[in-house]
Amino acid sequence: MTKVQNICLLESKIFQVILSQETNKATTMAVILETELQSLMFSSQIPDIVIGTSDDNEVEVCLDCRDHTIFSALHFPYGRSVKIHDLRSVVEYYLRDRNTSIEDFQLRAVTDGRSVTLATFKVLYLEQHFTGDIGEFLRNNFLTTMAGKLTSPMATEFLHFFIAAGSQETVRYQVVASVDDIDGGEPRVYQLTENCGTSNYDRIHRLEVTYEVMMGLVESPAQGRPRDAITIHAYSVHAGARAFTFYVQRHEPPLSLYFRNAFNVFERCDLQAVTTHKPKVDRSIAVTNRISTFYNQQNEKEYEVETSGLTVEQAKWIEQLFYSHDVRMATMREDYSEETYGSYNPTYMPQILITDFNCEIHDRDGELNSVKFTYQYADRRTYLQTDYLSVDHDRIFTSPYNPTYN
């Protein structure tokens, strides 16, 4: 064999090796997503992921969010297919940890060191199963399962709703109030409209609704009349086709909580309830020189709550309170100025843990529901009740002491 023939044979073998390597690479990169994913979906709607491969070589499946990987697993295909179960739980844990309700995600497959983007999609947090159309739901509903609720003059309420990129939403407030000497004290409707602005991305918009703001809508048309002459009966909030109504009760509820609901947004829960305080002490006893001494003492307190009558709708809504991973004890708001709006944040309020509950919901006519639950503060150190120390408290030195016994 001549030298030229040897060179040609060598080049032919090199070409075959290169061609074989390129063929193997092409085969390795043949990865396809067989599951259909919507561009926008609730977390509970994320299906099991099925990825088809052209061979049985290993494939790494990754889920990315905000330029970092939150899930990564190496799989070996069976029958040229990889199936990932319950990816929705990974997404929900991530959203809960970030205290957010909506994020963009990217699903990737990595084979032979090369990454292939299989899908990009947006997820909105929802723990419970949802079978309707997500677009229609978001256009017609705030992120709550209630259409209305009782509120009080000291309450700060939150409403959240979805705004698509490029959309412009207008919020309209309607207050039903009576003013003495105006129309004979008959209820009238006062309105305010504000624009939420536009954004280049999908977002969850938060509305902060207070009795003080609603009172401000009425005070101007009331022509300087004192607040005692103004009675607010209810106020409603409208954003597009969405609507929510707050009915005002004069007295403050004995127990007020904020909790992250099924959509992972804070919602206020005012309860007419009786609370039983149960302090206890966990400690050990040591005996030294025949003298007993306490040590390792830990003071704790549990609170047992029994609510008054609840409608079926209220009881089903409060069920989300028991499922919630983040429950806060509402603190008193002292400042309602415009400068403080947005700073009243339940995230900075004392966290509580609902350790036990009894919730049996029925829909019998003429009979209301009642739920019981037990909670304790996440910080095991007990709290000092200071409301009675206030100089403005109505129980201090406002009535004479009368030692009357039966």
What residue spans do the PLM features occupy?
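Extracellular/virion structural assembly segments
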Residues: T2-N6, A30-S39, F162, L217-R227, ...
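Preference for solvent-exposed, low-hydrophobicity sequence contexts
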Residues: M1-P253
